[in-house]
UniProtKB/Swiss-Prot annotation:
The keyword 4Fe-4S does not apply. InterPro entries: AAA+_ATPase, ABC1_TM_dom, ABC1_TM_sf, ABC_transporter-like_ATP-bd, ABC_transporter-like_CS, ATPase_T1SS_HlyB, P-loop_NTPase, Peptidase_C39. It is found in: Cell inner membrane. GO terms for molecular function: ABC-type transporter activity; ATP binding; ATP hydrolysis activity; ATPase-coupled lipid transmembrane transporter activity. SMART domains: AAA (SM00382). The chain crosses the membrane at residues 159-179, 192-212, 270-290, 296-316, 389-409. Part of the ABC transporter complex LktBD involved in leukotoxin export. Transmembrane domains (TMD) form a pore in the inner membrane and the ATP-binding domain (NBD) is responsible for energy generation. Residues 155-437 form the ABC transmembrane type-1 domain. Its main location: membrane. In LktB the peptidase C39 domain, the ATP-binding domain (NBD) and the transmembrane domain (TMD) are fused. This is Leukotoxin translocation ATP-binding protein LktB. Residues 469-704 form the ABC transporter domain. It comes from the Bacteria.
Length: 708
């Protein structure tokens, strides 16, 4: 019975965690009620049915350990003894397995032997509909195949032009052969004139067609580049907030800039060289007709080029990886330094920052130099093979001419044809560094484009928000191995109610509002607005109806009017002014020289802190949200600015649900109800005077500290 109970707990915990990973919220008690009918725990069948009810695609498979790196992770390792665990990542290089121990509620790294000892060969693969679509649209080199198919007509035209170019390339050596073997021997001036005119016509057509091919090809690849750039930016803005919190700004910027490498590769000569290489088989047939021996020399050189590239490529890729990492470090440090310039100057730490920059820059230059040296060695190796083949062909060709097996004209024609074959090979070999760089660029961009966006279980047509809020049995932490931030939080807020939330730093106040904005999905429990589970709601629909004012608000480098009307650029001036008056910002805006057309500067640098905050409040109010969140919105203001805002607070709160998070208790003392949080739990709630009556309570303690 105990084993069944344990299996029941672990199966349910696993389903909860996997659903959370796919941005789907669930109520464990409801799942247990529906699918654990006999009370003996979730069987394999009932587990799969429960997953299906959550719009998850779950499949039970048997997989050998050697093939685990091929499956989509995370997955549930199903154990007959009920001791299930999650398989998160397979490190094939070091033969290690990152798992999540559901019994200990902690991540665990297992060696090959440890994993083999506990793995019974059964997996449950879990994906959501959204993630299945994401896998089908996974960004790698195959992403360009649909783009090529889309522009197949243009690429077909390019292919036809390439065929004509190769025909002209085939004709030219034949003209030279005729001149050497016929015209010079028989002194045929009339034939020479005809061949010269014909050759001139061929050259003109070749130049025109070559330019046309480059133009058409560049035009189509530029359109692919535009599509990729647009998709990248849209996807970037659709990523969850956790993606940006777990990465440095400089890293993200560096990955986006990798688009330039792909652009240069697409519009360069590499792809046209591939087309030229495809026609080499025709040239080989003609060359074989001239001299099988000389053709075998050329054919024998091709494996040399391939083997040399195979030898160089892994080393080059490792060094390019290192170069990118150093470049990303520099980018991140530069962004951090520019962002923190006020602090750097205030603390006079420019020498220390410069020293760090010099070291990082030296590291980048060193890694870049190593890439250049290796690329040069690779190119010189290609040149060595080419020159060696040329010498062998010259020696062997001369012998064939002397022995009468080959004419001088045929030897010249053969060398011209071999040049047409080898030239694209050499160009591709020399462009191999670019290809390696593009491979890394695609991988880096894939980190952005393959990251799951904010998804929701279904597109429900939810009505306009009224303002009722409920947190039910909320348990949350930011990462599986991180401490619990919210634990068993239950809170109901009626529409039109003004709620104050206070507590020590790190007590979970701001996290509660982040769950309300659906920045995160709770590990357990539900967040409801007007009775609707936010896990089912479109995040954009939700956030458009919630106004948020933070302690540090960001203004864009635009006019005041554009900042206030950011969510609706075509908004009437009357609405903008009304929101500004409500936020107490209209008077100081009117005193500015350009008024509402004043450019605020980057992040609002041209305004004072109080002015920025009031514009941020106006921006939050302009859409008349039914729910308004003030997260330490007045804590950094001077008393005069705070007084102006607090004077208008009654008008601001009218007709909407308001959540005030503050350290200053004076900000929340007039709230309809005050929630006191401590270590992720609600420890007290009531009105200001009611909470003060409990002299041993946390609120009374904080109030006494502020009075003193």
């Amino acid at each position: 019975m105990e084993a069944n109970h344990q299996r029941n707990d672990l199966g349910l915990v696993a389903l909860t965690m996997l659903a959370q990973y796919h941005n789907i919220s669930l109520n464990p008690e409801e799942i247990k009620h529906k699918f654990d009918l006999d009370g003996n725990g979730l069987s394999l069948t009932s587990w799969l049915l429960a997953a299906k009810s959550l719009a998850l695609k779950a499949k039970h498979i048997k997989k050998e350990i050697s093939r685990l790196h091929l499956v989509n992770l995370p997955a549930l390792v199903w154990q007959d003894n009920g001791k299930h665990f999650l398989l998160v990542k397979v490190d094939t290089d070091n033969n290690r397995y990152l798992t999540y121990n559901l019994e200990q509620d902690a991540p665990q790294i297992l060696s090959q032997d440890e994993f083999e000892a506990c793995y019974q060969g059964q997996l449950i693969l879990v994906t959501s509909r959204a993630s299945v679509v994401g896998q089908l649209a996974k960004f790698d080199f195959t992403w360009f195949i649909p783009a090529v198919i889309k522009y197949r007509k243009i690429f077909l035209e390019t292919l036809i032009v390439s065929i004509f170019l190769q025909i002209f390339a085939l004709i030219t050596p034949l003209f030279f052969q005729v001149v050497m073997d016929k015209v010079l021997v028989h002194r045929g001036f009339s034939t020479l004139n005809i061949i010269t005119v014909a050759l001139a016509i061929v050259i003109i057509f070749e130049i025109v067609l070559s330019g046309l091919r480059t133009y058409v090809f560049s035009h189509s690849t530029s359109r692919i580049d535009v599509e990729l750039g647009a998709k990248l930016f849209r996807h970037l803005l659709s990523l969850p907030i956790s993606y940006f919190e777990n990465r440095r700004v400089g890293d993200t910027v560096a990955r986006v800039r990798e688009l330039d490498q792909i652009r240069n590769f697409l519009t360069g000569q590499a792809l046209t060289s591939v087309l030229d290489l495809l026609f080499s088989f025709i040239f080989f047939a003609v060359m074989w007709y001239y001299s099988p021996k000389l053709t075998l020399v050329i054919l024998g050189s091709l494996p040399c080029y391939i083997l040399w590239s195979i030898f160089i490529s892994p080393i080059l890729r490792r060094r390019l990886d290192e170069k990118f990492a150093r470049s990303a470090d520099n980018q991140a440090f530069l962004v951090e330094s520019v962002t923190a310039i006020n602090m750097i100057k205030a603390m006079a730490v420019a020498p220390q920052m410069t020293d760090t920059w010099d070291k990082q820059l030296a590291s980048y230059v060193s890694s870049s130099f190593r890439v250049t040296v290796l690329a040069t060695i690779g190119q010189q190796g290609v040149q060595l093979i080419q020159k060696t083949v040329m010498v062998i062909n010259l020696w062997l060709g001369a012998h064939l001419v002397i022995s009468g097996d080959l004419s001088i004209g045929q030897l010249i024609a053969f060398n011209m044809l071999s040049g047409q074959v080898i030239a694209p090979v050499i160009r591709l070999a020399q462009l191999w560094q670019d290809f390696q760089q593009v491979g890394i660029s695609v991988t880096r961009l894939g980190d952005v484009l393959n990251s799951p966006t904010e998804q929701y279980q279904g597109k429900l047509s939810l009505p306009e928000i009224q303002g009722d809020i409920a947190f039910k049995n909320i348990r949350f932490r930011y990462k599986p191995d991180a401490p619990t931030i919210l634990n068993n939080v239950n809170l109901e807020i009626k529409k039109g109610e003004v709620i104050g939330i206070v507590g020590r730093s790190g007590s979970g106040k701001s996290t509660l509002t982040k769950l309300l904005q659906r920045f995160y999905i709770p590990e357990n429990g539900q967040v409801l607005i007007d009775g609707h589970d936010l896990a089912l709601a479109d995040p954009n629909w939700l956030r458009r109806q919630i106004g948020v004012v933070l302690q540090d608000n960001v203004l864009l480098n635009r006019s005041i009017r554009e900042n206030i009307a950011l969510s609706e650029p075509g908004m009437s001036m009357e609405r903008v002014i009304y929101a500004a008056k409500l936020a107490g910002a209209h008077d100081f805006i009117s005193e500015l020289r350009e008024g509402y057309n004043t450019i605020v500067g980057e992040q609002g640098a041209g305004l004072s802190g109080g002015q920025r905050q009031r514009i941020a409040i106006a921006r939050a109010l302009v859409n008349n949200p039914k729910i308004l969140i003030f997260d330490e919105a007045t804590s950094a203001l001077d008393y005069e600015s705070e007084h102006i805002i607090m004077q208008n607070m009654q008008k601001i709160c009218q007709g909407r649900t308001v959540i005030l998070i503050a350290h200053r208790l004076s900000t929340v003392k007039n709230a309809d109800r005050i929630i006191v949080m401590e270590k992720g739990e609600i420890v007290e709630q009531g009105k200001h005077h009611e909470l003060l009556q409990n002299s041993n309570g946390l609120y009374s303690y904080l109030h006494q500290l502020q009075l003193n």
